[in-house]
Curated annotation (Swiss-Prot):
InterPro entries: Calcineurin-like_PHP_ApaH, Metallo-depent_PP-like, PPA2-like, Ser/Thr-sp_prot-phosphatase. This is Serine/threonine-protein phosphatase 4 catalytic subunit. The gene is ppp4c. Its EC number is 3.1.3.16. The lineage of its organism: Eukaryota, Amoebozoa, Evosea, Eumycetozoa, Dictyostelia. One of its GO terms (molecular function) is metal ion binding.
């Protein structure tokens, strides 16, 4: 299997899709591995933590240039692999293939875009249909989304989650008790982990996103104290500098999609933690235009002419 898998990884690294039958086999293997992982997946340092990628495949390649290749570097990706960029299929399948090949060297947690509903609106569904001619690959991938961990805990000290905290979660054990194998709900603790944002407010507030909550410094202090955490690491929000500390460095946002949507002009960052949890933010820019090949924004095939 690993020689097949290595060939598929090489193919995906060239931004070439693999066969539908190979996607099916890959997803089936990934499912077995992800089933064994917890809602709060344990990760050991040293580790490199990454934020949203959003189908920006050539920028993911830049990320690996800066951070090192997997398995030499131990990676944790905090979700939102798909949607908005042109290469969600290649991006997600490459990360999934690396997960199956090196399960202990790459951790993938779920973002709010790892959802059937959201991907039908923001591009992944349409891209799967365009590249494979049917919805089958989208179905295989969205089924895998249901098995992804909800969060990760580095050395018992650093809590990593896509979005943020929830008013219905006080302890990590309450996250461990969630049944995660489902579509992202519209409300409740699982939804909040993927949708919430930190804000300079006291306590909790409704979120303008229409899902999740806004939460303030006091909430973070209490959560970190009660769970013996040093800080919270999350993604979910574009930050122009690639990373942003809040609340006296008890929370950091990491954003890993440079020049987001190919027009925002932001840089991206990854957070490198050494074995003593010393932090280094590596900043990178979007891949140069000439390394990208032609953009894949072909019009959808006109089946009904």
């Amino acid at each position: 299997m690993s020689s097949d898998l290595d060939r598929q990884i090489e193919q995906l690294k060239r931004c070439e899709i693999i066969k539908e039958s190979e996607v099916r086999a890959l997803c089936s293997k990934a499912r077995e591995i992800l089933l064994e992982e917890g809602n709060v997946q344990r990760v050991d340092s040293p580790v490199t933590i990454c934020g949203d990628i959003h189908g920006q495949f050539y920028d993911l390649k830049e990320l690996f240039k800066v951070g090192g290749d997997c398995p030499q570097t131990n990676y944790l990706f905090m979700g939102d692999f798909v949607d908005r960029g042109f290469y969600s299929v290649e991006t997600f399948l490459l990360l999934l293939a690396l997960k199956v090949r090196y399960p202990d060297r790459i951790t993938l947690i779920r973002g709010n875009h790892e959802s059937r509903q959201i991907t039908q609106v923001y591009g992944f569904y349409e891209e799967c249909v365009r590249k494979y001619g049917s919805v089958t690959v989208w179905k295989y991938c969205t089924e895998i989304f249901d098995y992804l961990s909800l969060s990760a805990l580095v050395d018992g000290k650093i809590f990593c989650v896509h979005g943020g905290l929830s008013p219905s979660i006080n302890t990590l054990d309450q996250i461990r008790a969630i049944d995660r194998k489902q579509e992202v709900p519209h409300e409740g603790p699982m939804c909040d982990l993927m949708w919430s944002d930190p804000e300079d407010i006291p306590g909790w507030n409704g979120s303008p996103r229409g899902a999740g909550f806004l939460f303030g410094e006091d909430v973070v202090q209490k959560f970190n104290h009660d769970n013996n955490l040093e800080f919270i690491c999350r993604a979910h929000q574009l930050v122009m500098e690639g990373f942003k500390y809040m609340f006296n460095e008890t929370l950091v946002t990491v954003w890993s999609a440079p020049n987001y949507c190919y027009r925002c002009g932001n840089v991206a960052a990854i957070l490198q933690l050494d074995e003593n949890l010393k932090k280094n933010f590596a900043i990178f820019e979007a891949a140069p235009q000439e390394s990208r090949g032609a953009p894949a924004k072909k019009p959808a095939p006109e089946y009904f002419l």
